């Protein structure tokens, strides 16, 4: 395979945890970031252009996450002592940052897949996955961004990665309620307790089993019961005003809902058109009561994952 002068990769956003699948499940959704690479003449340097989300503050130097992923894959292909060529990197971002929709995972996966595509790379997706985990340690976002669908993952006792992917039917719509207030992953992590009660662990374990079956069997009632949590949501929901009450009322309306990733967004799964109005009204009401604006994304599952779209 020869090197290419120009590549463009599409990578989906993700919603991790889905309630009971804390740190082990995630789903890819059809909101996309795009990474374009173009090789430049030697001496041109690295040029990074950012469009869309984060354009005002995303790093445009070698600290950029996409560049770090590109550099890592290049060294994996050619060796650690080889100089990385000069590049023009264009990022078109649609995934909101710091909202629990996998923006960091999308950046790293996009950079890695684009580099493998450009630089004569024959690394498998599994090999790329291991590489990107060194930059982004959350497999629950990385795996669905790379492969698409619903992914379930674990780390074996021998410290090996293991995961499986389930294609998700596209009948169900996801409404993502995105409050206009950031929540860093670090702050969301710090809110978690050091120990959990045995009953809370059992609560999640029983629902995580059913959560996978609910998606496989298109069982909406089962999804409502299983998309629930006692390990992280009770603590994180208190970090954003109105979030706790909103989650309770959406679920109380019979709609499966969970904090997306570390938050602060909420992922709701709809089976009927009428439910969309309920979710939007509740989202506006609960956040506006605290002076927080909210945005809504109507999405569907993405079963393809990251892929080249320039041939």
Swiss-Prot record:
GO biological process, one term: threonine biosynthetic process
One cellular component term from this protein's GO annotations in UniProt: cytoplasm
EC number annotated for this UniProt entry: 2.7.1.39
Keyword field: Amino-acid biosynthesis, ATP-binding, Cytoplasm, Kinase, Nucleotide-binding, Threonine biosynthesis, Transferase
Coiled coil feature spans: none
Reactions this protein catalyses: L-homoserine + ATP = O-phospho-L-homoserine + ADP + H(+)
Pathway noted in the entry: Amino-acid biosynthesis; L-threonine biosynthesis; L-threonine from L-aspartate: step 4/5
HAMAP family in the cross-refs: Homoser_kinase
Protein name stated in the entry: Homoserine kinase
Native species: Natranaerobius thermophilus (strain ATCC BAA-1301 / DSM 18059 / JW/NM-WN-LF)
